[in-house]
Amino acid sequence: MDFVRGFWRKHRRKVLVTAGCLGSGYLLYKLYNSHTRRLADLERELAHERENDEIIKTQMKAHFESIQMIVDSTTLPHAMQFLSIRISEEIDVSHVMDRLNQGKGMLSPPEKLQLWDELKILSFTRMVLSLWSVTMLSLYIRVQVNILGRHLYVDTARALGSSHLLEEVDLIDRDDEQKFLSSADFLVTNAMPSLISDMQGSAEEVLKGKQLKDVITTRVLQETVMQIVDVFMSTGSPHHWVDYLMMPQDTKLSRTTSDSSDEAVSKFHQLMVETREVLISTEFTNIVEISLKCFTDVLVEEMETQTEAGGLATGKPLAKVLPQIEKTMNVITAEPSKNRFLQIIRDLPEVKLFFTLLYANMPQ
């Protein structure tokens, strides 16, 4: 006992210092070990999140590709068939051609000239209107289906708890979904008369200086078609052409839709407002211009290949070009699986990029 007391008195300071060091070291070890475990847990969580992100990206890519297939195999064929029938019904040139054929030797020169001039206007109106309608309707439907598909994917992810960013997204009612998709028929069922009238006015303005004996070459035909398109697109207020594709905008609705707290606004109206915002965007206007130009160039090139050697390339009188224009109608409005023009537009790099970015633009 005396030995212990003596040892303590003699080495107390050293013992306390040693104990303090050991205690501090143990505490530091525990802190380090705890910190290391937290870092390991965090790394596992981050790895899990990255894995989930990759899974979601893969699922989104697959869903995006399936949506494009739905457009090409289901939605677009129905719309194109409906459009083709309506254009044939509304712009019928057969009665003019019949009068020209039946009146040979019986019509006076002024009567014959008037009929040829009517045929000229109607032929160009029908060709350009068909070209414009097919292009715009195909792009519009693709916008619709991508917007709807994106919302449906988001709603599914929300229901499964796959994303913490989707808490405020409302589920789409089945009726709203069907109503939204069926609104693509607006062009054919509601807007066609005014579209024909305005397109015919544009054709008359561009063609008023062209005579039946004027020589039409490939380049002249391309320029003429694009001039009619440009006059039509630039007449009226900016983006007036959107009102041929969808019902006119309700400004009151647009304001209330921007307020996410207004539950009285249906999902259908939210989808329609979002669609209109896409259509009036600079990016969409750009792909419209690119698509219409591409369609026109390919169509005229195809017309050239179907003429006799040295036809449009060297030039033909306008009167002899009109029957060729009539032959293009079935080609322009052919079903999507056989429509070369739609396939070319769909595969344009600018169009592909636009719809990829549109689908990837997840609502916050």
Swiss-Prot record:
PANTHER family: PEROXISOMAL BIOGENESIS FACTOR 3. The keyword Glycosyltransferase does not apply. Residues 33-62 form a coiled coil. The chain crosses the membrane at residues 15-32. The lineage of its organism: Eukaryota, Viridiplantae, Streptophyta, Embryophyta, Tracheophyta. Keywords: Coiled coil, Membrane, Peroxisome, Peroxisome biogenesis, Protein transport, Transmembrane, Transmembrane helix, Transport. It is a single-pass membrane protein. It is found in: Peroxisome membrane. One of its GO terms (cellular component) is peroxisomal membrane. It holds the Pfam family Peroxin-3. It comes from the Eukaryota. One of its GO terms (biological process) is protein transport. Involved in morphology determination of peroxisomes, but not in import of peroxisomal matrix proteins. May act as a docking factor for PEX19 and be necessary for the import of peroxisomal membrane proteins in the peroxisomes. InterPro entries: Peroxin-3. It comes from Arabidopsis thaliana. This is Peroxisome biogenesis protein 3-2.
